[in-house]
A protein has these predicted regions:
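Intrinsically disordered, low-complexity, positively biased terminal segments
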Residues: 95-167
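Conserved active-site alpha-helix within GNAT-family acetyltransferase domains
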Residues: 67, 78-97
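Short coil/turn motifs at secondary-structure junctions
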Residues: 15-17, 47, 79
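Conserved GNAT acetyl-CoA-binding A-motif
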Residues: 65-78, 104
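Conserved acetyl-CoA-binding loop-helix of GNAT-fold acetyltransferases
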Residues: 41-66, 85, 89
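Conserved beta-strand-loop-alpha-helix junction that forms the acyl-donor binding cleft
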Residues: 44, 73-84, 129-131
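Conserved acyl-donor/pantetheine-binding loop and adjacent beta-alpha core of acyl/acetyltransferases
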Residues: 5-43
Length: 167
């Protein structure tokens, strides 16, 4: 709140039934010992946009969730460049692309709080245009995860994909 005005709102699902429902919709398979939380929407008042509020609230959520959960799952629209950049900056990895919420295309992203599963091997990474859904899905199927958004002068935005340590 700022001067009695709500600046931002963010949702998070931590209960097992809620997270299982989201994971089923996203078609995400996790290890048996994982206990994920799932973040939903984050809205920021127009007056406060551009001040990293989404980024800061994401870290606040992580402080709460990391105590009792092994990972955090979220989705971002491929059309939301700033939101995608914020989430990737928070060390999330793109692990899927799926139509959810009534047919809207979303990147499915995961952040693992277990240190042994965080590394990616950036040597030999792939650079895929953000609009090339099939190339991204192929990379994910081959064990790559999206980790960075880059802007190319002539060809627009691309996502860097690297092999995950477990792959």
């Amino acid at each position: 709140r700022h001067k009695g005005k709500l600046v931002t709102a963010r949702t998070i699902k931590m209960g097992r039934a809620w997270t299982d429902e989201a994971l089923e919709a996203y078609e995400i398979k996790l290890d048996e010992d994982e206990r994920p939380a799932v973040t939903g929407f984050c809205v920021v008042d127009w007056e406060f946009r551009g001040n990293n509020v989404q980024y800061l609230t994401q870290y606040l959520v992580e402080d709460i969730v990391a105590e009792t959960h092994t990972s955090l799952i979220t989705t971002v629209s491929p059309k939301n460049i700033f939101g995608l950049d914020n989430i990737l900056t928070c060390n999330f990895r793109i692990v899927g692309i799926k139509e959810v919420y009534g047919g809207y295309l979303r990147f499915i992203l995961k952040k693992d709080f277990r240190p042994s599963l965080l590394p990616i091997w950036t040597h030999g990474h792939l650079q895929i245009p953000i609009r090339d859904k099939s190339a991204q899905m192929k990379a994910i199927a081959e064990g790559y995860a999206g980790y960075k958004l880059v802007r190319k002068h002539k060809s627009g935005f691309h996502i860097l994909y690297a092999k995950t340590a477990a792959a």
